[in-house]
């Protein structure tokens, strides 16, 4: 079923691989690459807050390097 916000936060805090993020969270609504391609930004639209949450992926390791999840 759906994960709670806390479960999502706990999951992202472990710096999982991008494939694991997509498997767990589903496909992002939008993906952007940083200027030097070192970071990939996955945006997920959240209906409740009418805004996007962001997950940063390090392009060389493919691990989560940061996130903003409200």
Model-found features: residue ranges?
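Residues within mature, well-folded domains
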Residues: 1-70
């Amino acid at each position: 079923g759906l994960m709670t916000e806390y479960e999502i936060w706990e999951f992202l805090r472990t710096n999982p691989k991008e494939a694991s993020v997509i498997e767990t969270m589903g496909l992002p609504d939008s993906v952007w690459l940083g200027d030097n391609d070192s970071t990939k930004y996955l945006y997920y639209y959240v209906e409740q807050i009418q805004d996007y949450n962001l997950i940063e992926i390090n392009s060389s390791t493919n691990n989560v390097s940061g996130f903003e999840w409200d």
